[in-house]
């Protein structure tokens, strides 16, 4: 089939056109494994936090995340004819519960016929959808909160990492942990490190400071004041050196208009996390269905995916909330 015939086929019979990238069951089409992998890879690779967090491909709507650990010492002094007292491991469990989300990409017939990708159009379609999907996905994973935002808002549909983290520092209110209106960024980062569980500070290079652009610039400026090559690199090349061994990342998702709104959202946020402790899951089937609109001379491609996010251990990490009031105890 030549290019023109192929494109005409996509316009006139879009269901046939996507057969090469999907597996159909009872009229519902899901991406083949290689295209599923492409969708997830391209959705996450440009997202600072999502690309570093640990991904689980879910084979069921509910997946348990188990962890074990010891709350007391295991090793003890040996005494002849005396049995060790023994230490039982503590078990805990978190859950990922996949929720379905949908999105639509509309392409008019003229654009489709002029498409320069020709036979690679199906892959291009996935790339178009996954890139934007990834931006929204990361915003939800970070800022999601079922008790905030307006009804119908994407960020209200699930709880994200900020909501699920148990260690929080507050910048306003009685008993606040820091003064959100005036604290220096390096002072706040020092305080966040102090609040981080000490047992999990063994390898600081595995941790991350995630900062919105404003705070990242403040950190660059603070480092840039040093009369050294480190200061020159910071201001001249926008290089953020690690803070006390912890890499510092600019996470543009923390600039999200809704999530960072001081009235409906969380406002300004800084995070100190171990990405391997931040878990997100996506159900192994991503759906795609064409919806032909002949009167409008266009075809809408409806994507659907199920996902959730959480922690292996919600107590390992620190979130600093500049504009949130510390709850009364």
Residues covered by each model-derived region:
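Sequence/fold signature of self-assembling virion shell proteins
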Residues: 2-46, 53, 59-61, 156-190, ...
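Short coil/turn segments at secondary-structure boundaries
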Residues: 141-146, 203-212, 233
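Broad gene-expression machinery/nucleic-acid interaction feature
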Residues: 102, 206, 298
């Amino acid at each position: 089939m030549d290019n023109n015939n192929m494109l005409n086929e996509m316009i006139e019979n879009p269901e046939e056109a996507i057969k090469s990238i999907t597996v159909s069951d009872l009229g519902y089409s899901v991406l083949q494994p290689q295209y599923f992998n492409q969708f997830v890879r391209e959705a996450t690779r440009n997202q600072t936090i999502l690309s570093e967090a640990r991904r689980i491909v879910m084979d069921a709507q509910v997946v348990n995340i188990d962890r074990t650990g010891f709350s007391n010492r295991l090793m003890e002094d040996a005494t002849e004819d005396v049995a060790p007292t023994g230490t039982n491991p503590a078990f805990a469990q978190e859950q990922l519960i996949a929720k379905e989300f949908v999105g639509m990409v509309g392409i008019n017939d003229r654009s489709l016929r002029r498409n320069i990708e020709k036979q690679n159009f199906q892959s291009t379609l996935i790339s178009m959808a996954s890139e934007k999907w990834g931006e929204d996905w990361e915003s939800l994973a970070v800022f999601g909160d079922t008790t905030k935002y307006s009804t119908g808002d994407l960020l209200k549909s699930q709880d994200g990492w900020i909501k699920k983290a148990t260690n929080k520092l507050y910048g306003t209110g009685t008993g606040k942990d820091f003064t959100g209106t005036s604290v220096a960024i390096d002072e706040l980062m020092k305080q966040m490190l102090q609040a981080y569980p000490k047992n999990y500070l063994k390898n600081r290079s595995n941790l991350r400071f995630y900062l919105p652009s404003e705070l990242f610039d403040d950190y660059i400026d603070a480092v840039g004041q040093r009369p050294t090559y480190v200061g020159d690199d910071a201001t001249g090349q926008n290089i953020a050196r690690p803070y006390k061994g912890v890499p510092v990342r600019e996470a543009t998702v923390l600039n999200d208009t809704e999530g960072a709104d001081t009235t409906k959202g969380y406002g300004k946020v800084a995070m100190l996390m171990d990405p391997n402790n931040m878990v997100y899951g996506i159900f192994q089937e991503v759906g795609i269905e064409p919806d032909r609109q002949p009167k409008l001379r266009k075809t809408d491609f409806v994507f659907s995916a199920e996902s959730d996010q959480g922690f292996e251990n919600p107590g390992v990490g620190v979130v600093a909330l500049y504009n949130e009031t510390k709850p009364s105890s």
